[in-house]
Amino acid sequence: MDEKYSSNVISSGKLGRVEAPNARLTRYIVLLYFTKMLKAFGIFESYDILKVVHIVQFLFILKMGCAVILVFFQKPFSSGKMIPKRQWIKILKHAVISCIISLLGFFGLTLCGPLRSLLLFEHSDLVVISLLSVLFTSSGGGPSKTRGAAFFIIAVICLLLFDNDDLMAKMAEHPEGHHDSALTHALYTGIAFLGVADHKGGVVLLVLALCLKVAFNTASRKLSVEIGGAKRLYALSNLVSAVVLLPWVIVLSATTESKVESWSGLIFPFAMIIFSVMILDFYVESICMAKLETSRCARYGAIFLFLNGLLLANFWTHPLTGQIRAISTTGQQSSTEHVLSGGVLVSACFFIMADSILSAPSSKGQKGTLVGYSPEGTPLYNFMGDALQHTSQSLPRFIKDSLKQILEEYDSRQIFYFLCLNLAFTFVELFYGVWTNSLGLISDGFHMLFDCSALVLGLFAALMTRWKATRIYSYGYGRVEILSGFINGLFLMVIAFFVFVESVTRLVDPPNINTDMLTPVSVGGLIVNLVGICAFSHAHSHGASKGSCSGHDHGHSHHGHGHSSMEHSHGGHGHSHGGHGHSHGHGHSHSSGGMNANMRGVFLHVLADTLGSVGVIISTILIRQFGWLIADPICSLFISTLIFLSVIPLLKDACEVLLLRMPPQHEKELNFALEKIQKIEGVLSYRDPHFWRHSASVIAGTIHLQLMSDVVEQRVIQQVSAVLKDAGVNNLTIQLEKEAYFQHMSGLSSGFHEVLTMTQQMESMKYYKDGTCIM
């Protein structure tokens, strides 16, 4: 069979997107790199020119220069069909909106500087649309897209909060006299109304302009098709924009004083900006999108632009760079504002990662119908639909659904309320510590923040236990609460150990302690933790009956969903096996071994904090009244010992569950149940009984039963399921074995010793036809 018609097309990777050879793509990637480098240089040059040229005049020159070149080369009037009047009105609207977006972008450039403008405004439409779809739709593209959206938001936050821009220099350059037109005055007034600095207002303005630009480009696609192509629309729109701006420029030239000493010195800078920013970038990006994938073009373009922007920002004020751009200087001294900072570097890294993720194509697997097999035995599928993978929810919807699930159940609701209270106290403590410059308050606030991580772990575990079972996690996620309790217990043991070691060290050499703020902080922490103890003590004392219900008065009846076994006969062997008896919701109360380990771990964390607050209050009183500095390490020793001793039972119970130990509180009932099973009519013996606790509310078990050849299997399954259900097992699997089963196992070439053991066990039990067994 010819290779192209073989069944190995899928495995050989020959089915899918047809890609050009890498050597042919390299030239376009190199071209895109140099284009983005020139565009970054043009943006930096634009920032310098905007210091002396009014923003409206600057935009008019760019639009007019771009229109002249495009009309000459593109010939939008002679090529293509004639444009009717209705289309000219649409072009006029397109040009006006384009001018507004460009004005916002260039004004943001004057506020934030060239590098930050590149990072905020120069993103592909694909990236922004992917970001918005993650945030506001249910088809965001999976966890990777959500991660990319998070990186993008973090990058913007870094520019807002951690970018230490030279605000003092900006304030010195921004007196009221700088408002040389109504437009700039209105924009500055709007930013001042927000109550933020010009730099932060510029960040917000550029983000808004970016969203408007993407929406504008998306809406313009239909118009470009009607006009006769995007290039023709671009040429006509720039020409109309220049015509619209011309009266405004004439009025500004007549009413304002120009800061330009010589317009002839700006000819080359303007020509370079028009060529690199307005023309070259548009045409090269169109070519690369046609030759490369749109996602690859967007990803490479953003990375190249950001990296060149970082490079230029580092060397723009260097003397060598000044010599290179000496022909375009305007007589102004180079400014030192908008320099590189740690915040902008971190932001650039996050922007690069976000654009790389958000511009990547959504890889969706496909579900198909099995239509047959190839001669080699390879399955053949008919692909009809979308991916097997589930679409991820949008972030607001995910938060809303999670909060709804948290507030539905008692345990998670209690943890959530206490977490909110704890976080509120933590941030108040941190704020007051920063306000008063108290290192003790700040350190205690971060300690409380660490404690909140244990509550978050417990809350997440309580939420996961209600997730539905999947094909991979067929038992569900009930055991997550055990893992949460185990991890919280380990955290507490580590904390207790380090507190104990530090206390022993301080016993030898007690340090001086500043007790000024200890008492109010400890009293506040004690009040918060007492609320937590009251909230979690019920769960701590009631155990699994609390962990498996939603409220205090909810219980499970004995309706017991039973699934009878299916009898499988194989080729005349008469082999029957496997009984599944799932019965949910027994009415037995459990002792501490079956209690909710997750809630126990949370309770012990709160108890440890409470003991710590009590210890601090006692030691503070003793130090203030009697000067006993040794009281602090003694209280710490006592508290760490209590924490350690209280955690041991939790770790012991969690380890027993994780090691699949038979539940201790059910051990006697299970042994008695096995004796009753031995006496059921038709049961010869049993082997391999396994019983373990899966979670606080689920006890699982498996057992093999040897039966007489003429017994009714369903009756035996029903009786055995009832016996083990009374013993507390609510997830049961039964395998029935008759004489034909051993013959079948021998035919399948099972292990000799296994078959021999089972055969000897069967032969040792002789029984009459009436069912009387003789051992």
UniProtKB/Swiss-Prot annotation:
GO terms for cellular component: cytoplasmic vesicle; endoplasmic reticulum membrane; ER to Golgi transport vesicle membrane; Golgi apparatus; Golgi cis cisterna membrane; Golgi membrane; secretory granule membrane; trans-Golgi network membrane. Residues 547-592 are annotated as: Disordered. Residues 50-52, 116, 170-189, 254-263, 321-338, 436-444, 501-516, 624-627 are lumenal. The keyword Transport applies. It is found in: Golgi apparatus, Golgi stack membrane; Cytoplasmic vesicle, COPII-coated vesicle membrane; Cytoplasmic vesicle, Secretory vesicle membrane; Golgi apparatus, trans-Golgi network membrane. Residues 571-589 have a biased composition (Basic residues). Keywords: Antiport, Cytoplasmic vesicle, Golgi apparatus, Ion transport, Membrane, Metal-binding, Transmembrane, Transmembrane helix, Transport, Zinc, Zinc transport. It is a multi-pass membrane protein. Zn(2+) binds at H447, D451, H605, D609. Residues 538-584 are annotated as: His-rich loop. It catalyses: Zn(2+)(in) + 2 H(+)(out) = Zn(2+)(out) + 2 H(+)(in). SUPFAM superfamilies: Cation efflux protein transmembrane domain-like. One of its GO terms (molecular function) is zinc ion transmembrane transporter activity. Residues 1-28, 74-94, 138-148, 211-232, 285-299, 360-414, 466-479, 538-602, 649-775 are cytoplasmic. It comes from the Eukaryota. InterPro entries: Cation_efflux, Cation_efflux_TMD_sf, Msc2-like. Heterodimer with SLC30A6/ZNT6; form a functional zinc ion transmembrane transporter. Together with SLC30A6 forms a functional proton-coupled zinc ion antiporter mediating zinc entry into the lumen of organelles along the secretory pathway. By contributing to zinc ion homeostasis within the early secretory pathway, regulates the activation and folding of enzymes like alkaline phosphatases and enzymes involved in phosphatidylinositol glycan anchor biosynthesis. Belongs to the cation diffusion facilitator (CDF) transporter (TC 2.A.4) family. SLC30A subfamily. This is Proton-coupled zinc antiporter SLC30A5. It comes from Danio rerio (Zebrafish). The gene is slc30a5.
